[in-house]
Amino acid sequence: MSLSILTTQLSFEHDVVLVRQRARQVAKLLGFDAQDQTRIATAVSEIARNALNYGGGGKIEFEVNGKTAPQLMVIRISDRGRGIPNLLEIMEGRYQSRTGMGLGIVGARRLMDQFQIESAPGAGTTVLLKKLLPATADLVSQQRMN
């Protein structure tokens, strides 16, 4: 089961601030403590900024996967940019451009439980940020979200 919570567009600089705030709010709603809320908001902010600055903007989707505990918070950030040419070097921590590109990706990966990135030349980039909901969190269902 995948339950969509929020989808928002990323087009302007103020959208990065907004999506960081939304990430924190969604994390709180899902039962994450203050420290994890900050981790999630920071990871989302880093990837959203990359999507805006290097990918020309895009879309951010928040969802919860799973019917039983532990459920998984999934944040999908996709852009329509040119792709990331040095992805392997970035993921291994061996690459940094003069503008700092690469640090946000590695940092976001460290803040989340699971991290996936797909990028192809001319086809944009999609990043999946995933974090297990806390054991103490109530199960998320369509009924609860209504």
Indicate residue ranges for each PLM-predicted region:
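Conserved beta-strand-loop-beta-strand hairpin that lines the nucleotide-binding pocket
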Residues: 1-6, 48-146
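Bergerat-fold GHKL ATPase/HATPase_c domain
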Residues: 1-42, 141-146
